[in-house]
């Protein structure tokens, strides 16, 4: 029997694939558990339509991510933190702090998508990566300054 997988099944394939299995396996396990549906002419057409819509959606997201990456790479984020006389911070600058600085400049990125090579524990200039989409990553330029320091 031909079926369309609705969920990933380790021994058969990924969601959306059309596979052939024995009737008993399909009728007694895969279909009742919601792992698959019968592959009829109508469901196959619906699957093709769904795949086309998904491809368009992914391409739109990829285009938006590229534009956002170009915008982010032009920015230099200024993060204010409490620091001692030697330039050492009281605490660390986290991905959450960087996400807040981005949000202040009109870019909303989840803090979990920002990757720091090492914790930021001193004043200075740093770089971080922000994963915007599957294969699109933007470089962030971060400048950590002392809170309350007068700009001259």
From Swiss-Prot:
Gene3D superfamilies tied to this protein: Ribosomal protein L9, C-terminal domain, Ribosomal protein L9, N-terminal domain
Query: What are the GO BP annotations of this UniProt entry?
Result: translation
Molecular function, one GO term: rRNA binding
Q: Which Gene Ontology cellular component annotation is one that this UniProt entry carries? A: ribosome
Q: Where are its TM segments located? A: none
Domain of life from the UniProt record: Bacteria
Alphabetized Pfam families for the sequence: Ribosomal_L9_C, Ribosomal_L9_N
Keywords (A to Z) from UniProt: Ribonucleoprotein, Ribosomal protein, RNA-binding, rRNA-binding
This molecule's function is given as:
Binds to the 23S rRNA.
Among HAMAP family, the record links this protein to: Ribosomal_bL9
Q: Which family does it belong to?
A: Belongs to the bacterial ribosomal protein bL9 family.
Q: Which PANTHER family match?
A: 50S RIBOSOMAL PROTEIN L9
What protein name applies here? Large ribosomal subunit protein bL9
The species this protein belongs to is: Chlorobaculum tepidum (strain ATCC 49652 / DSM 12025 / NBRC 103806 / TLS) (Chlorobium tepidum)
